[in-house]
């Protein structure tokens, strides 16, 4: 390969990586902002109950956050300290699921994680769709672990994003978490 061809290919790939990174960052940040808004609503209410008022507030937040316009996001759910779904943005009555054994739940309950936690890709216990879970914990008014707010990005979103780019022959994209866990491979 000639030097000018190599330089062009390098520049094109750098631009491609930058565009993909920006799109991924925007998506994950949008989901996180939705989770933050729900956590703040729960903590400011001073209670966690599956009341109609709380359910309506959850739907309102999810509906008006920009992330709902994305086909990437599944439902946002609120999970109590025992790991049970108690509020569900996608259903009047929360669908039954327990996530007490999942890494994103244990990070908050057992290890006191602060901030956003990106879980291992897993099939949703509610829909069965392979997803990347994103969670934020919340506290009770007494400062104890109250549960988590969970959103999930469908793995098909990543594959669709990567497929929309002409990667060229024998090329691929891998997306990893900070600890090396593969999120998506295309």
Protein language model features and the residues they cover:
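Short acidic, glycine/proline-rich loop/turn micro-motifs
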Residues: 47-48, 88-91, 186
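N-terminal post-signal-peptidase region of extra-cytosolic proteins
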Residues: 58-62
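Short, glycine- and charge-enriched coil/turn segments that flank and shape catalytic ligand pockets
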Residues: 48-55, 140-143
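Juxtamembrane extracytoplasmic/periplasmic/luminal helical "stalk" adjacent to the first N-terminal
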Residues: 1-50, 68-74
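Solvent-exposed, acidic/flexible segments
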Residues: 10, 28, 51, 55, ...
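Extracytoplasmic/periplasmic ligand-binding sensor regions of membrane-associated signaling proteins
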Residues: 67-75, 82-165, 169-172, 178
């Amino acid at each position: 390969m000639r030097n000018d061809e190599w330089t062009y290919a390098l520049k094109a790939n750098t631009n491609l990586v930058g565009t993909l990174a920006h799109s991924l960052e925007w998506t994950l940040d949008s989901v996180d902002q939705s989770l933050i808004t729900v956590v703040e609503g729960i903590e400011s209410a001073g209670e966690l109950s599956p009341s109609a008022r709380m359910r309506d507030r959850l739907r309102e937040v999810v509906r008006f956050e920009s992330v709902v316009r994305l086909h990437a996001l599944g439902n946002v759910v609120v999970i109590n300290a025992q790991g049970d779904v108690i509020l569900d943005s996608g259903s009047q009555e929360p669908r039954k699921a327990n996530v007490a054994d999942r890494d994103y739940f244990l990070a908050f309950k057992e290890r006191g994680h602060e901030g956003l936690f990106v879980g291992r890709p897993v099939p949703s216990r509610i829909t069965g769709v392979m997803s990347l879970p994103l969670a934020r914990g919340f506290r009770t008014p007494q400062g104890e672990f109250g549960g988590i707010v969970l959103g999930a990005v469908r793995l098909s979103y990543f594959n669709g994003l990567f497929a929309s780019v002409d990667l060229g022959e024998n090329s691929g994209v891998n997306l990893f978490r900070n600890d090396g866990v593969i999120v998506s491979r295309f």
